[in-house]
Amino acid sequence: MKKWIAGAACALASWHALALQPYVNGGKLAAADLAGAVAMVEQKLSGAGLTVLGVHMAKGLPKQATVVVSDAGMADAIKGIGGSAVVGLPIRVGVKADGSVSYANLEYWQRAYLRKDYGKAEPAVKAAAVKLEQALGGGPAFGGDVKTEDLANYRYMFGMERFDSGNSLLKEYANFDDAVKAVRDNLAKGVKATSKVYEVVVPERKIAVFGVAMNDPEYGEGWWVNKIGADHVAALPWEVFVVNGKVHALYGRYRTALAWPSLGMGQFMGISIHPDRTREMLEAVAGVQ
């Protein structure tokens, strides 16, 4: 019996060693309010050599925020890969009003986003992860296990989208500059109650990524995140990315599942209209009439 228990424990440990979770807990801050906590996080991240791109405070989620940053080394590696890899350039850090901090587990997200090219960026990804841990602390990971080997081709279940599913394409323009201008203009107009959180444009590689706040009171982030659980603070904001003249956004059934991999089917069904409603908002950002 003891041997069986020991064997089971080893098997469980082996499973966890081969699986990753999307978020890492940081150390708790002694901030008195959300604004103070955000300011402290920005200071810590800047002090670690990371560049603050923007701050996202989602409508309907008043007790949390996301600080979005970039790391020069990881950004250079992603620019070198090019194409859709640009969606992995921003790093999301979640902050709560009670001082709780969490951040994206970079290995998890970059294995999913860079896929077969992950190895090219791995040293830079690991170096950026060290900076995050030094700045914010490194507690236990959380959010739901996904086997490391499954991330490059991840989907929640049979029939659902993967990273490269065709319905990520929102609109195609004649060239890169036209595509970027359309996204910028539409975010400035606030189409479909959206707004810009950040942008990173790399004209020499013809790639760009924009963070998009979806502020619609009925179908925006506050609605569906509150239904499935707001602890995954560093899941937001969503991205629109441009490659050459094409504007893309990861489809909701993929992007949401990747950010909440332990979500039950019943919870998914409770937000079943979220992927299409979100796509409609992002289509408007892309310039779809």
Language model segments and positions:
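Hydrophobic alpha-helical segments and helix pairs
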Residues: 101-143
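Terminal, regulation- and interaction-focused segments at domain boundaries
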Residues: 19-60, 137-207
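Positively charged n-region of N-terminal signal peptides that target proteins for export
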Residues: 1-4
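A cross-kingdom marker for long, charged
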Residues: 198, 205-289
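N-terminal signal peptide c-region/cleavage motif recognized by signal peptidases
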Residues: 14-16
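Mid-chain, structured segments of secreted extracytoplasmic proteins
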Residues: 63-105
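Acidic/histidine-rich, surface-exposed loop or edge segments in extracytoplasmic proteins
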Residues: 19-29, 111-114, 160-167, 250, ...
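Stable alpha-helical elements in mature extracytoplasmic
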Residues: 37, 41, 121-128, 132, ...
